[in-house]
């Protein structure tokens, strides 16, 4: 028995993440499974569809919660994180979904990772690169930037006309912060 080829994505999204943020990958993975069944195609290894939740950091300030939980790597500190709009903890939210949050902090994977050969995720582009290209319609991503937000930082300064007031006399808060 060879380890399975796993495909899927996350069901959550970020604000303005696009209509099909992670869902495109779930639908694509299910479409492949349906095609295999309908055509009778039998791959050399099992094909598994995987859907995760809470991969985005927009609600609890931590990304990959679903993956970390699936691999038993969540911590008590993670479970105490509060939802940005309703104030419920991650542990409360997991319980409301019908799961025991304590099962996700044991250090033991919920799934047997040795039975997975690879994970393939089809994902929409959330930027303009492919959309503006006449040549490329598909891209392969080799890395992405991290996600870090500072919601409580304030830049305080004075406004001044950039054409009339020399830079040395301005107190531009954003410029000072950037420098």
How would you name each of these model-derived features?
Residues 31-38, 179:
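Short glycine/serine- and small hydrophobic-enriched flexible loop segments
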């Amino acid at each position: 028995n060879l380890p399975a080829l796993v495909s899927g994505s996350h069901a959550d999204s970020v604000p303005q993440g696009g209509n099909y943020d992670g869902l495109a990958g779930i639908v694509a993975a299910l479409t492949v499974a349906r095609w295999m069944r309908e055509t009778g195609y039998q791959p050399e290894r099992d094909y598994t569809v995987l859907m995760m939740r809470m991969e985005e950091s927009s609600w609890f300030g931590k990304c990959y919660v679903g993956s970390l939980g699936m691999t038993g790597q969540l911590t008590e500190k993670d479970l105490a994180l509060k939802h940005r709009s309703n104030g419920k903890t991650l542990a409360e939210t997991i319980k409301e979904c019908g799961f025991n949050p304590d099962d996700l902090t044991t250090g033991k994977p919920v799934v047997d990772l040795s039975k997975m050969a690879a994970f393939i995720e089809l994902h929409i582009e959330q930027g303009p690169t492919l959309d503006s290209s006449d040549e490329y319609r598909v891209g392969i991503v080799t890395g992405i930037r991290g996600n870090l937000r500072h919601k409580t930082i304030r830049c305080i300064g004075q406004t001044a006309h950039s054409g009339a007031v020399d830079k040395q006399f301005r107190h531009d808060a954003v410029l000072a912060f950037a420098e």
